[in-house]
Protein backbone atom coordinates (compact mmCIF):
# COMPACT_ATOMS: atom_id res chain seq x y z
CA UNK A 1 0.00 0.00 0.00
CA UNK A 2 3.03 2.22 0.18
CA UNK A 3 3.38 2.58 -3.58
CA UNK A 4 0.61 3.24 -6.10
CA UNK A 5 1.00 -0.21 -7.59
CA UNK A 6 -0.37 -3.62 -6.74
CA UNK A 7 1.53 -5.54 -4.08
CA UNK A 8 2.71 -8.89 -5.45
CA UNK A 9 1.05 -11.77 -3.66
CA UNK A 10 4.35 -13.62 -3.35
CA UNK A 11 5.89 -10.71 -1.46
CA UNK A 12 2.89 -10.47 0.82
CA UNK A 13 3.13 -14.14 1.68
CA UNK A 14 6.83 -13.78 2.38
CA UNK A 15 6.64 -10.85 4.77
CA UNK A 16 3.13 -11.05 6.15
CA UNK A 17 1.93 -13.65 8.64
CA UNK A 18 -1.35 -13.53 6.77
CA UNK A 19 -0.14 -14.81 3.47
CA UNK A 20 -3.04 -6.38 8.36
CA UNK A 21 -10.46 35.51 3.69
CA UNK A 22 -11.63 38.52 4.04
CA UNK A 23 -10.22 40.74 6.77
CA UNK A 24 -12.63 42.41 9.18
CA UNK A 25 -12.14 44.26 12.40
CA UNK A 26 -13.15 42.14 15.39
CA UNK A 27 -15.55 43.70 17.90
CA UNK A 28 -13.92 45.35 20.89
CA UNK A 29 -13.01 42.82 23.55
CA UNK A 30 -12.75 39.87 21.16
CA UNK A 31 -9.50 38.53 19.66
CA UNK A 32 -8.70 39.24 16.03
CA UNK A 33 -9.53 36.23 13.80
CA UNK A 34 -6.52 34.36 12.47
CA UNK A 35 -6.47 34.85 8.65
CA UNK A 36 -4.62 31.56 8.25
CA UNK A 37 -7.30 29.63 10.11
CA UNK A 38 -10.01 31.40 8.13
CA UNK A 39 -8.33 30.50 4.86
CA UNK A 40 -7.91 26.90 5.87
CA UNK A 41 -11.53 26.58 7.00
CA UNK A 42 -12.68 28.26 3.78
CA UNK A 43 -10.65 25.83 1.73
CA UNK A 44 -12.00 22.86 3.64
CA UNK A 45 -15.56 24.06 3.11
CA UNK A 46 -14.91 24.41 -0.62
CA UNK A 47 -13.54 20.89 -0.86
CA UNK A 48 -16.37 19.32 1.13
CA UNK A 49 -18.97 21.26 -0.89
CA UNK A 50 -17.91 19.59 -4.12
CA UNK A 51 -15.38 21.96 -5.70
CA UNK A 52 -12.67 20.26 -7.77
CA UNK A 53 -10.90 17.73 -5.64
CA UNK A 54 -8.45 15.15 -7.03
CA UNK A 55 -9.38 12.71 -4.26
CA UNK A 56 -13.02 12.67 -5.39
CA UNK A 57 -12.34 12.71 -9.13
CA UNK A 58 -12.61 9.17 -10.57
CA UNK A 59 -9.16 8.31 -11.93
CA UNK A 60 -7.60 5.01 -13.07
CA UNK A 61 -4.12 4.11 -11.88
CA UNK A 62 -1.33 4.95 -14.30
CA UNK A 63 0.31 1.78 -15.59
CA UNK A 64 3.82 2.94 -14.76
CA UNK A 65 5.27 -0.59 -14.75
CA UNK A 66 3.68 -1.47 -18.06
CA UNK A 67 2.19 -4.85 -17.15
CA UNK A 68 -1.45 -3.80 -16.88
CA UNK A 69 -2.04 -5.60 -13.58
CA UNK A 70 -4.30 -2.97 -12.07
CA UNK A 71 -6.65 -2.95 -15.04
CA UNK A 72 -6.53 -6.75 -15.23
CA UNK A 73 -7.65 -6.97 -11.61
CA UNK A 74 -10.43 -4.49 -12.26
CA UNK A 75 -11.66 -6.55 -15.21
CA UNK A 76 -11.51 -9.69 -13.09
CA UNK A 77 -13.62 -8.05 -10.40
CA UNK A 78 -16.20 -7.01 -12.98
CA UNK A 79 -16.27 -10.58 -14.31
CA UNK A 80 -16.60 -11.98 -10.78
CA UNK A 81 -19.57 -9.75 -10.15
CA UNK A 82 -21.41 -11.21 -13.14
CA UNK A 83 -21.65 -14.78 -11.86
CA UNK A 84 -21.78 -14.32 -8.07
CA UNK A 85 -24.44 -13.15 -5.66
CA UNK A 86 -22.56 -11.65 -2.71
CA UNK A 87 -24.23 -10.35 0.40
CA UNK A 88 -21.16 -8.30 1.30
CA UNK A 89 -18.62 -6.58 -0.96
CA UNK A 90 -15.30 -5.27 0.33
CA UNK A 91 -13.59 -2.58 -1.70
CA UNK A 92 -10.43 -0.63 -0.99
CA UNK A 93 -6.66 -0.84 -0.95
CA UNK A 94 -4.12 -3.44 0.18
CA UNK A 95 -5.59 -3.72 3.68
CA UNK A 96 -8.66 -5.16 1.96
CA UNK A 97 -6.67 -7.13 -0.61
CA UNK A 98 -4.36 -8.83 1.92
CA UNK A 99 -7.28 -9.74 4.17
CA UNK A 100 -8.37 -12.18 1.48
CA UNK A 101 -5.21 -14.22 2.13
CA UNK A 102 -5.86 -14.59 5.86
CA UNK A 103 -7.69 -17.49 7.43
CA UNK A 104 -9.83 -14.84 9.10
CA UNK A 105 -11.41 -14.19 5.71
CA UNK A 106 -12.40 -17.82 5.36
CA UNK A 107 -13.53 -18.00 8.97
CA UNK A 108 -15.55 -14.79 9.21
CA UNK A 109 -16.38 -13.38 5.80
CA UNK A 110 -16.59 -16.24 3.32
CA UNK A 111 -19.70 -17.56 5.13
CA UNK A 112 -21.29 -14.17 4.45
CA UNK A 113 -20.83 -14.71 0.69
CA UNK A 114 -18.36 -11.85 0.50
CA UNK A 115 -16.40 -10.57 -2.48
CA UNK A 116 -13.02 -8.88 -2.08
CA UNK A 117 -12.33 -6.01 -4.49
CA UNK A 118 -9.14 -4.75 -2.86
CA UNK A 119 -6.15 -3.47 -4.85
CA UNK A 120 -2.88 -2.48 -3.22
CA UNK A 121 -1.97 1.18 -3.53
CA UNK A 122 -5.46 2.41 -4.40
CA UNK A 123 -6.61 5.83 -3.28
CA UNK A 124 -10.15 7.13 -3.10
CA UNK A 125 -10.01 8.40 -6.68
CA UNK A 126 -9.09 4.93 -7.95
CA UNK A 127 -11.90 3.22 -6.06
CA UNK A 128 -14.34 5.77 -7.45
CA UNK A 129 -13.20 4.99 -10.99
CA UNK A 130 -13.57 1.26 -10.43
CA UNK A 131 -17.06 1.65 -9.01
CA UNK A 132 -18.08 3.88 -11.91
CA UNK A 133 -16.74 1.35 -14.41
CA UNK A 134 -18.56 -1.85 -13.67
CA UNK A 135 -17.65 -3.26 -10.27
CA UNK A 136 -21.14 -2.56 -8.91
CA UNK A 137 -23.20 -3.18 -12.03
CA UNK A 138 -24.10 -6.87 -11.84
CA UNK A 139 -24.56 -7.42 -8.10
CA UNK A 140 -26.97 -6.35 -5.39
CA UNK A 141 -25.10 -6.73 -2.10
CA UNK A 142 -26.71 -5.98 1.21
CA UNK A 143 -23.57 -4.31 2.54
CA UNK A 144 -20.57 -2.61 0.92
CA UNK A 145 -17.48 -2.27 3.12
CA UNK A 146 -15.14 0.61 2.18
CA UNK A 147 -11.59 0.83 3.50
CA UNK A 148 -9.45 3.31 1.60
CA UNK A 149 -7.72 6.66 2.03
CA UNK A 150 -4.34 6.05 3.61
CA UNK A 151 -2.71 6.01 0.15
CA UNK A 152 -3.98 9.47 -0.78
CA UNK A 153 -0.55 11.05 -0.61
CA UNK A 154 -0.48 14.68 -1.64
CA UNK A 155 -4.12 15.21 -0.70
CA UNK A 156 -5.27 17.05 2.40
CA UNK A 157 -7.35 15.40 5.10
CA UNK A 158 -10.34 17.40 3.88
CA UNK A 159 -9.84 16.18 0.32
CA UNK A 160 -9.50 12.56 1.40
CA UNK A 161 -12.61 12.76 3.56
CA UNK A 162 -14.54 14.23 0.64
CA UNK A 163 -13.27 11.39 -1.54
CA UNK A 164 -14.54 8.80 0.94
CA UNK A 165 -17.87 10.59 1.16
CA UNK A 166 -18.06 10.57 -2.65
CA UNK A 167 -17.60 6.79 -2.61
CA UNK A 168 -20.42 6.44 -0.10
CA UNK A 169 -22.63 8.66 -2.22
CA UNK A 170 -21.89 6.66 -5.34
CA UNK A 171 -22.69 3.38 -3.59
CA UNK A 172 -25.93 4.86 -2.27
CA UNK A 173 -26.81 5.90 -5.82
CA UNK A 174 -25.88 2.66 -7.58
CA UNK A 175 -26.93 0.28 -4.78
CA UNK A 176 -29.76 2.00 -2.88
CA UNK A 177 -30.67 -1.22 -1.07
CA UNK A 178 -27.18 -1.59 0.42
CA UNK A 179 -25.77 -0.27 3.63
CA UNK A 180 -22.25 1.14 3.51
CA UNK A 181 -19.72 0.46 6.25
CA UNK A 182 -16.68 2.75 6.20
CA UNK A 183 -13.70 1.54 8.20
CA UNK A 184 -11.62 4.20 9.89
CA UNK A 185 -8.09 4.75 8.65
CA UNK A 186 -5.53 3.19 10.96
CA UNK A 187 -2.49 4.91 12.45
CA UNK A 188 0.72 4.21 10.57
CA UNK A 189 4.48 4.43 11.10
CA UNK A 190 6.46 3.05 14.03
CA UNK A 191 6.74 6.47 15.65
CA UNK A 192 4.45 9.53 15.72
CA UNK A 193 4.37 11.25 12.34
CA UNK A 194 2.24 13.68 10.30
CA UNK A 195 0.43 10.88 8.44
CA UNK A 196 -1.01 9.61 11.70
CA UNK A 197 -2.35 13.08 12.40
CA UNK A 198 -3.76 13.31 8.89
CA UNK A 199 -5.51 9.94 9.13
CA UNK A 200 -6.96 10.93 12.50
CA UNK A 201 -8.35 14.11 10.97
CA UNK A 202 -9.80 12.19 8.03
CA UNK A 203 -11.61 9.92 10.48
CA UNK A 204 -13.06 12.89 12.35
CA UNK A 205 -14.37 14.44 9.14
CA UNK A 206 -15.80 11.21 7.75
CA UNK A 207 -17.50 10.32 11.02
CA UNK A 208 -19.20 13.72 11.07
CA UNK A 209 -20.16 13.57 7.39
CA UNK A 210 -21.72 10.11 7.63
CA UNK A 211 -23.76 10.97 10.70
CA UNK A 212 -26.43 12.43 8.41
CA UNK A 213 -26.54 9.40 6.10
CA UNK A 214 -28.98 6.82 7.51
CA UNK A 215 -27.62 3.92 5.44
CA UNK A 216 -23.96 4.60 6.16
CA UNK A 217 -21.98 3.42 9.17
CA UNK A 218 -18.56 4.49 10.38
CA UNK A 219 -16.54 1.88 12.27
CA UNK A 220 -13.33 2.72 14.11
CA UNK A 221 -11.98 -0.77 14.78
CA UNK A 222 -8.55 0.32 15.99
CA UNK A 223 -8.04 -1.69 19.21
CA UNK A 224 -5.21 0.59 20.31
CA UNK A 225 -2.35 -0.09 17.92
CA UNK A 226 -0.46 2.95 19.23
CA UNK A 227 1.18 2.10 22.54
CA UNK A 228 1.55 4.47 25.47
CA UNK A 229 5.02 5.47 24.27
CA UNK A 230 3.63 6.44 20.86
CA UNK A 231 5.00 3.43 18.98
CA UNK A 232 3.32 0.77 16.87
CA UNK A 233 4.54 -2.82 17.19
CA UNK A 234 5.70 -4.90 14.24
CA UNK A 235 3.67 -7.71 15.80
CA UNK A 236 0.54 -5.77 14.80
CA UNK A 237 1.82 -4.17 11.58
CA UNK A 238 4.75 -6.02 10.08
CA UNK A 239 5.94 -2.97 8.14
CA UNK A 240 4.18 -0.42 10.37
CA UNK A 241 1.41 -0.08 7.81
CA UNK A 242 0.04 -3.49 6.80
CA UNK A 243 -1.54 -5.73 9.39
CA UNK A 244 -0.30 -9.09 10.61
CA UNK A 245 -2.77 -11.79 11.53
CA UNK A 246 -2.53 -10.57 15.12
CA UNK A 247 -3.37 -7.07 13.94
CA UNK A 248 -6.19 -8.14 11.65
CA UNK A 249 -7.92 -10.21 14.35
CA UNK A 250 -9.50 -7.46 16.52
CA UNK A 251 -10.32 -5.34 13.46
CA UNK A 252 -12.03 -8.21 11.67
CA UNK A 253 -13.94 -9.41 14.70
CA UNK A 254 -15.33 -5.93 15.35
CA UNK A 255 -16.30 -5.62 11.69
CA UNK A 256 -17.81 -9.09 11.61
CA UNK A 257 -19.98 -8.30 14.63
CA UNK A 258 -21.29 -5.15 12.93
CA UNK A 259 -21.98 -6.98 9.66
CA UNK A 260 -23.94 -9.67 11.48
CA UNK A 261 -26.05 -7.04 13.23
CA UNK A 262 -26.79 -5.26 9.98
CA UNK A 263 -27.58 -8.46 8.09
CA UNK A 264 -29.82 -9.71 10.89
CA UNK A 265 -31.62 -6.38 11.09
CA UNK A 266 -32.22 -6.53 7.36
CA UNK A 267 -33.86 -9.95 7.69
CA UNK A 268 -36.16 -8.98 10.55
CA UNK A 269 -39.86 -8.91 9.60
CA UNK A 270 -41.53 -5.51 9.70
CA UNK A 271 -43.14 -4.69 13.03
CA UNK A 272 -46.92 -4.21 13.00
CA UNK A 273 -48.11 -0.69 13.54
CA UNK A 274 -49.77 -0.07 16.92
Predicted segments with their positions:
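N-terminal secretory targeting modules
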Residues: 1-91, 95-107, 262-274
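Acidic/histidine-rich helix-loop elements
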Residues: 61, 116-121
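A structural signal for isolated positions on well-ordered beta-strands in alpha/beta enzyme cores
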Residues: 89, 145, 179-181, 217
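Active-site flanking residues adjacent to catalytic metal/cofactor-binding acidic residues
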Residues: 91-93, 148, 219
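Short, glycine/acidic-enriched loop or turn micro-motifs at the edges of active sites
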Residues: 96, 121, 223
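Oxyanion-hole/transition-state-stabilizing segment in secreted/luminal serine hydrolases
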Residues: 97-108, 113, 124-174, 181, ...
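Conserved beta-strand scaffold positions in the cores of enzyme catalytic domains, especially
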Residues: 114-116, 218
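Catalytic His-Asp segment of secreted/periplasmic serine-dependent ester chemistry enzymes
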Residues: 187-274
